[in-house]
Structures are given as C-alpha cells and as structure tokens.
Amino acid sequence: MTEKLTEVEARIVGALIEKQLTTPEYYPLTLNSLVAACNQKSNREPVVAYDEETVTKALENLREKNVVYVFYGSTSRVPKYKHILPDVFELEPPETAVLCVLMLRGAQTLGELRERTSRLYEFSGLGEVNETLDNVMRINAPLVVKLERLPGQKEARFAHLLAGEIDVSAYAKENTISNKQADNQRVENLERELENLRTEFNLFRQMFEDFKKQFE
C-alpha cells in the first residue's frame, strides 16, 4: 500500500482489527456494526459521529487501496467487511495490536500501549512493547514514529504514520489545549469538592448547635 489513509479510513481499519480480536464471533462486520464500532465512546480518541455515507465512501477507498474487502457469507446476502492490514505490511500480532490502538486512540506512551492492548495481545512487559515499536519504526517505510516529549509530559509518545507524517506543531497545540482543559477540569472538581465540604461542615455545625440546645 503506497497511498496513505485518511483519518476516517484509519478509524475504520482500527475498528475492524479491534472487533476481529475481541469479538471474533461477530466478525466480519456489517456496515451498521462498523459504523457503531467507529462511533463508540469507549476506547476512542477522539469520539466521532460518522454516518453511513461517510463510512461507505471510506470503505470504497480502502477496497481500492487493498486494505479492506467485502465478504459475503453462505447464509446471508448482507455484505460484511474484513481488513487485511497484517498481510499488506507483513505484521506480527503484537505489531497489529499496537497499530490498532494508535489508530483508535491517537498518540500513546509505552505504558498506555501495554495497558490498552491487553484485550488484543498480551505483552510480557514494557520491554516487549518497546521492541515491537522498534520493529515497525525500523522498516523501510516506518509505520510508527516516536514523538518528542512535550512540556508537561513525563514520557514520550508514539503515533502511527498510516495517515502520513505527524504535524508536530499541530500535535503540540492540541496537547496544550488538552492539558489546559484537564487542568480546568481539575480546578472545577476541587472547587466542587470544597463547596461540598463547606456544606457538610455547616450541616454538622447546625446539628451540633441543635444538640447543645438540648442541655440548655
């Protein structure tokens, strides 16, 4: 495959890999199931809301790129979709699992990859995750890149290159916005907790005053 994937196409391929490995009894996926898999709110970053037309158009492109093909079962005329990404890039199971998570959840640290691939492949430790990343970064056309650690980050992150080179400046800006949103959320949570404590304190004080009055 020489052509890069779009963000929609990468989400579709990631969703197909995930469902193949976690719910093989429902794989290949129908169009409806695939749309739902792309749009699910858990294990997705960002959360999207693709319609059938968007997914159908992307599937047509993926078929032209020889990454996805249509499957018709012997008992159903409803078309179902399969991916063949490991065949295209000669990927081993751990490499497929890592790419799946990167396509579904964006840039990840070593620890996040080990945790979030647990249903797809059981890594023995961070060393095996790192070795797997090295494998897909050392090939002639690397599939993964290690991103520079940004201010406020404790660890470097890794991102897939199936959709092309990473815009580092855009990534840094997005990460900064995300960090600010997280900080704002933490402040809001602390303010809410403080207000709850004040309310509880006032309640206990009133209860104590009422208790004292019994002996006056």
List where the protein language model places each region.
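Amphipathic alpha-helical oligomerization/assembly segments
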Residues: 177-200, 204-215
